[in-house]
Structures are given as C-alpha cells and as structure tokens.
Design a protein with these regions (language model features):
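Short glycine/serine/threonine-rich phosphate/pyrophosphate-binding segments
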Residues: 105-112, 133-134, 244-245
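Active-site segments that bind and position negatively charged phosphate/pyrophosphate groups
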Residues: 198-302
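Generic secondary-structure signature for well-ordered alpha-helical cores
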Residues: 89, 158-162, 167-174, 182-194, ...
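Residue-level signal for inorganic ion chemistry
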Residues: 23, 42, 127, 165, ...
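C-terminal charged capping/lid subdomain of soluble metabolic enzymes
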Residues: 5, 17, 182-184, 279-347
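Alpha-helix C-terminal capping segments
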Residues: 109-120, 249, 275-276
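ATP/NTP phosphate-donor binding region
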Residues: 2-97
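A glycine/threonine-rich phosphate-anchoring loop and its flanking beta-alpha core
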Residues: 12, 112-203, 324-325
Length: 347
C-alpha cells in the first residue's frame, strides 16, 4: 500500500490538464497544492463528517461551507439553484473557486454548479468515498438528474485538481466502502487482469492504495484519448446500462436492504455483459467475497423502460459494452428491446 500512497498522476488534456494527488493527509494540506487566497465555496453533504469540509475551509482566506442533504435527491435543479444562490450571496466572482468534499453526488453537483456559474469557474474535487476516489472524481463529467432520469442534464467540466486522501475512508461505512469497489472490479475486467486478481486473492483493505491508483490510471488513459465520450470512453459505461435501469426503479428488494447503491447496481449490470461463463462465475465469486450482490428482484419491464431514457439510447438503439474475456471489451449497438433477454441473467 505504501508504494502507491503518495502517488501523483497527471490528467493530460492540454490546457485543461490537472494533477491527481493520492496521498494520506493531503486534505489537511490542500493549501500546498492549490491557490486558496480567494473566495472558496466548499460543497459537502450531511453524510460526510463535517470536519472534512471545515478542514478545507480553515485553509482558505475567505470560505463558506454549503451543506446539502445526503443522497441522490440532492442532484436536482432545486438543490442546484440553492447552491448557486449561496455562491452568489457569498459574492463569488469569476476568479473564485468551488471545492467538492464528499462522494459522487457532491462531486457531480458542485462540479456542475462550477461549470455554469458565471459561465464557468475553477473547481477542485476532494473525494471521500471509494466510489468517487476510484472513478467519478476524475474525467470532468458533472450533472444533475431530471426526476428519476440520472445525469441527463450536465456538462464536461474538468477540475483544476483532484485530492485523494485515503485517510477519509476511515469514517466511511463498510457497505459504502464495498459499494465503490465495483468500479475497480470494472476496471480490472476491462483492462487490468492484475487488478482483478487482487479482488480474487488479496485482502482489499490492505491493497486499497493500489486499487485506487490502478483504477485511476485506467480511467485516466481512457479520458486522455476520448475526453467527451465520442468513442472509447464508452467502455467506462460497462455495467451502467442495466445498472442505471435497476438503480432508477423504485422499491427494488436488495439482498440486504430495500434499494441498492450505485456501485451495487453497476455490479449487477456487468454480469449479463460478460460473455464467458467461466469469467462470469469468477466475477460472482469476487462479488460474494467482497459482499456485493449477485442477484436482486426487479421488474424487467420497468428497468427496460428506464433504459429507454439512457443517454446512450438513440432511435430505439443503444450501445452496450460487452466483455468476451478478462482484459478485453467491445462496443455493440443493439435495439433497446435486445436487452430484454439479458435482464434475468444475474443469478
């Protein structure tokens, strides 16, 4: 783990390039990496320990903390307007800064607010969950939901800096910790057999630094080649087509609770897209080892209806990502109705 904690990666996107710092204690030393001598809006949610946002605010010359309610419901126009209003009331200008401190919801919301406030101001992402550290904190996707349709209104807005402080995972509930690992399993399946092997054989808590860094390197390489998802970045949607459909349907009975987290839904969404039965069996074994669900009860028709609203669906067609074997993938465009036989495969 020590070989990876202390890593600096650089997202190479020309004038929009930025550093990704993976380092213990980096959140309380944000001032070493970023210019904080301006007005700073620190956006967080009620599920994030308050000391993390305060830790950032204390390093700033002039800061305000904006706290939204925990959960996907905060990715709404109403909450977005509230955040923007607080930024305006704080007197923020074009040279000021938004810092997200939290998980994927906070990053999406704060990043989108930064992208549209005065036509775009600086944004720093400080993820505090495994899901956001491993995946959503880099790449520039920001969005809010429209009703039950996820991420349908948004923008590509790259952060100026990403600070990944693994120390913040110490306060993360166990189920949330495991939930985020689904995106790392995805990276292993698509392009990194060694990463997948960690999940099969190792104690993930002992290797979390390596898991984070390997996952970030994979996503970084994809985004650098296809920033706005015109081609190969679509690979990152592996598991998300069915996963988003499951996530959007209300009242799903999960293995442990009513309602599944995003990573749990992605995990379920990946299984039908794995063409090798042997690999599918190995992945189910990994899920059981980690504590991710391998099955759930859902209404197939409702899930299919939700997938019609998927951003990848056009004219009744949808591009899906299939994995024929470990470390390889392909994109395939099929009728949305063609997803029907895949929906009952996770058992």
């Amino acid at each position: 783990m020590s070989d990876f904690i202390g890593t600096k990666l650089t997202m190479n996107l020309g004038e929009r390039s930025y550093d990704i710092i993976v380092k213990r204690g980096s959140l309380e030393n944000l001032y070493q990496f970023a210019r904080l001598d301006r007005r700073v809006a620190v956006v967080t949610d009620s599920g994030v320990p308050a000391q993390y946002a305060q830790m950032v605010a204390d390093q700033c010359k002039d800061a305000t903390i904006i706290t939204v309610s925990q959960g996907e419901a905060s990715k709404s126009f109403k909450i977005l307007e509230t955040v923007l209003r607080q930024m305006l009331d704080f007197g923020m200008g074009r040279g000021d800064l938004v810092v997200a401190v939290g998980g994927g919801v906070v990053g999406d919301l704060a990043g989108f607010a930064a992208s549209i406030y005065m036509r775009g101001i600086d944004f720093i992402n400080c993820p505090t969950t495994t899901l956001s550290m491993i995946d959503s904190s880099i790449g520039g996707k920001t969005a809010v939901d429209l009703g039950d349709t996820k991420n349908i209104v948004g923008a590509f807005w790259q952060p100026k800096l990403v600070i990944v402080d693994p120390d913040t995972l110490s306060t993360l509930p166990r189920r949330h910790f495991i939930n985020g690992l689904a995106e790392a399993v995805k990276a292993g399946l698509l392009a990194d057999p060694e990463l997948f092997s960690i999940f099969e054989k190792e104690v993930v808590d002992d290797r979390i630094g390596e898991i984070i860094c390997r996952s970030l390197r994979f996503k970084k390489s994809i985004v650098e080649q296809d920033e706005t998802e015109q081609g190969m970045r679509k690979a990152l949607n592996f598991g998300h087509t069915i996963g988003h459909g499951i996530e959007a349907v209300k009242g799903i009975k999960g293995r442990r609770t009513t309602g599944l987290f995003h990573g749990e839904c992605v995990a379920l969404g990946m299984l039908p897209m794995i063409e090798s039965k042997a690999l599918q069996k190995r992945v189910r074994g990994v899920y059981r080892r980690l504590g991710l669900p391998t099955r759930t009860a859902y209404d197939k028709e409702k899930v299919l209806a939700e997938m019609l609203h998927d951003k990848k669906a056009q004219g009744g067609q949808i591009t899906i990502i299939k994995v024929p074997g470990l470390g390889c993938w392909r994109a395939e465009t099929i009728p949305v109705e063609g997803l029907r036989p895949l929906l009952g495969m996770e058992d």
